[in-house]
């Protein structure tokens, strides 16, 4: 078997594993600590910067498959393997980045700036999910949630320490709170918090 076919086979196995994880409604099998930053530019809301820190067991399994040269580090090519294995299967779930705008969720247009590293035995990934909502003269309100509704991956998102990056031309206010009363989030665990944002032109 050629090395390219071997790599393709390993990637396919990873994709199948992650696809099953997304579709399964079960007790959590993977654990990840999440931090987020809401991003704005002069045009308005532009996306969510994500940092996911996985548990040691999942990290070891992913590294065993993705670390092709077995040096315990993640090269650019190996990061590409991880990006495909982790994010491709959850594309239809909006990469677990749910942003309520009115009565709908915003759709992620693309993923950018993906990075991966191993830190103290844990796989850490960083990426930006691009979503857009233009600024207006009056307040625009959003609710940001990063979570797996199936709870196969238990994502603990620290919304109390979430951050916002915005230009001086915008006025942005935000706070963390529960999701009670928000019908779009009925399928989510009751303890999950959202980042409530409102913004307008100064």
Regions found by a protein language model. Give the residues of each.
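Structured domain cores in non-transmembrane regions
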Residues: 57-132
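N-terminal signal peptide c-region/cleavage motif recognized by signal peptidases
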Residues: 19-23
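Mature, soluble, non-transmembrane domains
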Residues: 100-202
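Short solvent-exposed loop/turn micro-motifs enriched in small/polar/acidic residues
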Residues: 29-31, 91-92, 109, 190
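Short, hydrophobic/aromatic beta-strand segments
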Residues: 47, 60-64, 137-143
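Early extracytoplasmic/domain-onset interaction patches
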Residues: 28-54
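Bacterial N-terminal signal peptides that target proteins for export
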Residues: 2-13
């Amino acid at each position: 078997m050629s090395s390219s076919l071997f790599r393709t086979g390993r990637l396919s196995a990873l994709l199948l594993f992650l696809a099953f994880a997304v579709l399964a409604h079960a007790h959590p099998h993977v654990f990840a600590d999440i931090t987020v930053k809401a991003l704005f530019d002069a045009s308005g809301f532009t996306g969510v910067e994500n940092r996911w820190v996985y548990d040691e067991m999942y990290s070891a399994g992913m590294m065993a498959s993705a670390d092709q040269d077995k040096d315990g580090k993640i090269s650019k090519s190996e990061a590409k393997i991880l990006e495909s294995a982790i994010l491709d299967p959850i594309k239809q779930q909006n990469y677990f980045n749910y942003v309520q705008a009115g009565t709908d969720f915003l759709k992620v247009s693309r993923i950018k700036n993906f990075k991966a590293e191993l830190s103290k035995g844990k796989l850490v990934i960083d990426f930006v999910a691009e979503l857009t909502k233009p600024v207006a003269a009056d307040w625009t309100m959003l609710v940001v949630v990063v979570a797996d509704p199936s709870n196969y991956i238990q994502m603990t998102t620290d919304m109390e320490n979430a951050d916002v990056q915005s230009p001086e031309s915008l006025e942005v206010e935000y706070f963390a709170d529960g999701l009670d009363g928000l019908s779009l989030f009925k399928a989510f665990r009751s303890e999950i918090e959202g980042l409530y944002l409102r913004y307008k032109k100064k």
